[in-house]
Each structure stands twice: as structure tokens, then as C-alpha cells.
Amino acid sequence: AINVGSLFAPTTAVGIKRWAEESLGYSSNDAYHFSFMVACAALILSILIYYAFRFTFRHVEGGKKKGEAAVVEDNLTPEQTKQRIVALCLVFAVVIFFWMAFHQNGLTLTYFADEFTETTAFGFDTMLFDVWNLALIIVAVYATFSIFQSDSAKGKLFSGVLASGVLAFLVYRAMGIEPNAEIAVAAPIFQQFNPFYVVALTPVSMAIFGSLAKKGKEPSAPRKI
């Protein structure tokens, strides 16, 4: 859900900023505040939804029942303890350096995109900067995997029709683009590609790990990360 929201957030933020500039007359330096305002309102709404519907998932929340016996854990050997500490250190190293780089996405990399990348797309490339085209590609990927994973013939048929329809629509849109067509690309739009790859490649990675698991070669969690 986070990555789906991150996929649409750049386009939404740019659209709100443009609306504030064109309709309300705000300068570029002030109009972006409206995008943050909408994000803040969405966060407040999500918290309200969480507490309003908390009763629907309270049964899966943590906590021990009254009178429940305490769980006695086995003592680990020094070798087992060492293995777990090494695994934790590997995870910590990956997580620390990943987030050090990832958190540059909202500021440093956006500055880089604004100042050092081409902000105009031409021809077929214009499709890649339309978030709806990326969303359709994701639908096509999941529908294609569903063809092989569905247990019923009806499910396979529906998935096949959906994947074929989406791909046909994308081809139709691509054929309607003139070679000299061009669009201006705002720097924040480049942020939509990371969540796109995360969502689109999730079934691919799951299929790979599932295949390895069947062969008894599934990598450990640190190796997956």
C-alpha cells in the first residue's frame, strides 16, 4: 500500500501545486505548500480510519490473554547466539545504508533530477512519465502471473483476458503518439519509478523465491534483503 501511494503521490503533488499556481495565483515557491497540506490531511484521515475501524482487526493485535501461561524459551548455545548476532549485524548494515541512500530521494535526488536531467520527454518516452500507464503495466504483470497461479479455468481465463486487454490498450495508446510529441517533466515525477519497480517486480521476486523454496534452496531473510 505504501508503494502504491508513493507511485501516485508525485503526480498528485505536482497537479496540486500547478492548480495553486494557475487558479489561486500563488508563486512556485509558495504553491508547493498546498501539496504538503493535502498530504497532512490524508495522514489525519488515515489515523481516523484506523481508530474508527480498529474493532475489525482487534483480534489480531498483540498481547497475552489473561491466565495464559508464560512461554518458556530454550536457552541458545553460544554458537546459535553468535549466528543470530551475525545475522542481525548483516541486516542492520543493509538497512542502515539502504535508508541512507533512499532518504535522498525526496530532496537530493529531486534536486539532481531538476538540475542535471532532461526535463522534456519526446515520442514514446512520454508514456513512461504518465502514472496511469505505469499502473496499467502493473495490472498486466499481476494478471499475467495470475494466469499461471490461478487454480480454476475461469480465473485463468479472466486473468488472460485482463492482461491481453491492458496490453492492447497500452499498444493503442503508444500508436497514437506522434514521434515529435513532447511533454515537460517535473522533477518530482522521477520519484514514481522506484515504487513502480517495487510493485511490478514483487510477483517476479516471489516466484523466484517460491521456486527456490520448492528445491530446498530458498535464501535466508538477510540474503533476500
Language-model features, listed with the residues they occupy:
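C-terminal substrate/ligand-recognition segments
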Residues: 158-160, 186-225
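Hydrophobic alpha-helical transmembrane segments of integral membrane proteins
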Residues: 6-7, 199
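Extended hydrophobic secondary-structure segments that form protein cores and membrane-embedded regions
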Residues: 1, 34-39, 223-225
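Intracellular loop-helix junctions on the cytosolic face of multi-pass helical membrane proteins
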Residues: 14-183, 205, 209-215
